[in-house]
């Protein structure tokens, strides 16, 4: 649930442990 500070491109996030939700990267 914490924003990782980047949008996700092609449904992937460059920051480990983060997942793409609604166009943005979140972790927990």
From Swiss-Prot:
Presence of the UniProt keyword Disulfide bond in the record: yes
Keyword Disulfide bond: yes
Entry keyword set: Disulfide bond, Knottin, Plant defense
Modified how: This is a cyclic peptide.
Record remark: domains: The presence of a 'disulfide through disulfide knot' structurally defines this protein as a knottin.
Family named by the database record: Belongs to the cyclotide family. Bracelet subfamily.
Protein name in UniProt: Cyclotide vodo I3
Species of provenance: Viola odorata (Sweet violet)
């Amino acid at each position: 649930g914490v924003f990782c500070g980047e949008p996700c491109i092609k449904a992937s996030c460059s920051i480990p442990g983060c997942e793409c939700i609604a166009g943005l990267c979140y972790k927990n």
